[in-house]
Amino acid sequence: NTVYTSEVLTKFMDIQPGQVLNSVYVGQKIQGINAAYARDGYMLAHVDGIRVDDQGMLHVHIVEGIVEDIIPAGNKKTRDKVITREFVQKKGKPFNKFLVRRSVERVYNLGFFDDVNVRMLPGEQDPNNVIIEIDVLEHKTGTITLGAGYSKSDGLMGIIEFGEENFRGTGDK
């Protein structure tokens, strides 16, 4: 467990040494742990199992739903690192819906995409983990301006201007 310390989780359980275990009471405490994770945005985290060892110690196994990878998809021009650098949700950390939502907003706010969506794929190392696929639909970021004019003093004159908001896919102008 990385989100909550063992001490915090022990307080959630509120079971004293020597106390007789009641399965309904333990079930309610487990629901409380799951609810706390969900409330704080860790929607993949859950109690995966409980056991009592030979010494009568209660062990609670928690799966936190770790992000194994963040994979950009649909980007033809924009480089992967331009998209992934905007992610506040990090690989190797528990999945948090609030961080993912903020990450999607940051990618969209780059101004290079018409649409940004997230797909969650099962982890390859552990099915309780997740791979985040960030699917983008790029829009045109280049502009060209042509202009012409004529004056008696200068004669015919013209202007050609090229602009690119996502130069070489790096996010540079």
Predicted features and spans:
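Periplasmic polypeptide-binding modules associated with outer-membrane biogenesis and secretion
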Residues: 1-164
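Short loop/turn motifs that connect adjacent beta-strands in outer-membrane beta-barrel proteins
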Residues: 167-173
